[in-house]
Amino acid sequence: MILLIDNYDSFTYNLAQYIGNFAEVQVLRNDDSKLYEEAEKADGLVFSPGPGWPVDAGKMEDMICDFAGKKPILGICLGHQAIAEVFGGKLGLAPKVMHGKQSNINFEAPSVLYQGIEDGHAVMRYHSILIEEMPEDFEVTARSTDDQAIMGIQHKNLPIYGFQYHPESIGTPDGLYSIRNFIEEVVK
């Protein structure tokens, strides 16, 4: 079972539908009293997009700290930013708001999440915050071709991954494959 932590975002159930193609999925809000109990039972954790700054998103950052190294973790948009922040990265406002904007990305490091996906593929972006400084134990897996923003990260030793873009959006045609790869190759 994959536990999808909902950061009060309208895309959460699109993401749940994608995950549900490959595994049982349970959705709980980021402030639900049962989060830790259900996370213990889960095979992997996915932190959804959401509004605002990661530090204000319920129990998300605490959960990332508590489950890092114990459960595979995937963060999307706000979840991606939270992973970076928890591990010592720095966030900042994007020079240009990227709500509903499509970019192409180039891979910078090999990642199991990009298996079967061509370099340069299109992704949909909905963010005004981004990673400015990477955490030491992480590597950049993808950058946007138009503004060189960090679009993908992974921990160097643990099964922890992040996407700044929205794989569940129709504007990310290959997004389903990344979700599949997380579940089939990482969570297993």
State what each model feature region is.
Residues 24-32:
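A short beta-strand-loop structural module common to alpha/beta enzyme folds
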Residues 42-111, 122, 179-181:
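Cysteine-nucleophile active-site neighborhood
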Residues 2-21:
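Short, charged N-terminal beta->alpha structural module
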Residues 169-188:
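Acyltransferase
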Residues 11, 130-132, 170-171:
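Active-site environment of divalent metal-dependent phosphoester hydrolases
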Residues 111-158:
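Catalytic beta-strand/loop cores that center a nucleophilic Ser/Cys/Thr
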Residues 33-42:
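Short amphipathic alpha-helix with an adjacent loop that forms part of the alpha/beta core around
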Residues 1, 24, 43-44, 72-74, ...:
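Structural signature of beta-strand start/N-cap positions in the alpha/beta core
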